[in-house]
């Protein structure tokens, strides 16, 4: 019976400076807002995001900080028993990228070597402060990276898909059907192409140890 179907569930911690778009990102999912649960002792909201795949359903229980990061760091209880993580920064704010190593350090201190994705949100903005060629932290730490625009759904599913493949050990896993709400607007394709071109070029050159993160 369908009610007895086994659905793999993963705890996903979503971290990054306040205002980078973490909650907006989660709420783009069709079920992201309606089924959330609040954990007052940790000050977090847990959003169960379900995805249909060619191997059946899978679910990420996304822990969103609910603004707690503004009060200086997160409690270890937020990180404990996490299966994977997304670190988010805002490409229109250089300081949010400079703080990425701090978030990475906090995760690895508690969780060690869980799969992680670094995402640069708000790539739809015209005044991009963190250029694609400057984003190198993921290369130094062997993380996956994606440009993202939560409001336009650009690359919305890619972080989840990459993590689902890693966690299930199914490299051929794909998502089936729609999982995101209709986009708020259409992203400028010229901006997308230029950023993708820069990322490709950056990946082909040696890592610059003097880039803008520490």
Swiss-Prot record:
PANTHER family: GTP-BINDING NUCLEAR PROTEIN RAN, RAN GTPASE
TM segment ranges: none
Keyword Lyase: no
Record domain Small GTPase Ran-type: where: 6-170
SMART domains: RAB, RAN, RAS, RHO
Binding site for GTP: 17-24, 67, 121-124, 149-151
NCBIfam families, per the entry: small_GTP
Subcellular location: Nucleus
Result for mutant: residue 196 to G: In strain: IT04
This protein's GO CC annotations: cytoplasm; nucleus
Chain positions covered by the region annotation Switch-II: 67-83
PROSITE patterns per UniProt: RAN
Entry protein name: GTP-binding nuclear protein Ran
Keywords: GTP-binding, Nucleotide-binding, Nucleus, Protein transport, Transport
Homology family: Belongs to the small GTPase superfamily. Ran family.
A biological-process GO annotation: protein import into nucleus
InterPro entries in alphabetical order: P-loop_NTPase (IPR027417), Ran_GTPase (IPR002041), Small_GTP-bd (IPR005225), Small_GTPase (IPR001806)
Chain intervals for the UniProt region annotation (Switch-I): 36-44
Main location: nucleus
SUPFAM superfamilies: P-loop containing nucleoside triphosphate hydrolases (SSF52540)
Native species: Plasmodium falciparum
Functional note: GTP-binding protein involved in nucleocytoplasmic transport. Required for the import of protein into the nucleus and also for RNA export. Involved in chromatin condensation and control of cell cycle.
């Amino acid at each position: 019976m369908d009610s007895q179907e086994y659905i793999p569930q993963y705890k996903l911690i979503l971290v990054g400076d306040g205002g980078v778009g973490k909650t907006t990102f989660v709420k783009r999912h069709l079920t992201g807002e309606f089924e959330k649960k609040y954990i007052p002792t940790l000050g977090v909201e847990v959003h169960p995001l379900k995805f249909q795949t060619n191997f059946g359903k899978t679910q990420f229980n996304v822990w969103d900080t609910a603004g707690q990061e503004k009060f200086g760091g997160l409690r270890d209880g937020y990180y404990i028993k996490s299966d994977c993580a997304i670190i988010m920064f805002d490409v229109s704010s250089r300081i949010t990228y400079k703080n990425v190593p701090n978030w990475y350090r906090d995760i690895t201190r508690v969780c060690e070597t869980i799969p992680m994705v670094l995402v640069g949100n708000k790539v739809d903005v015209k005044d991009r402060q963190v250029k694609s060629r400057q984003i190198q932290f993921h290369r130094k730490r062997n993380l996956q990276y994606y440009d993202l625009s939560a409001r336009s759904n650009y690359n919305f599913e890619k972080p989840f898909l990459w993590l689902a493949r890693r966690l299930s050990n199914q490299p051929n896993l794909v998502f089936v059907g729609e999982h995101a709400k209709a986009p708020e607007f259409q992203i400028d394709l010229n901006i997308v192409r230029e950023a993708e071109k820069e990322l490709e070029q950056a990946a082909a050159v040696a890592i610059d140890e003097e880039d803008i993160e520490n």
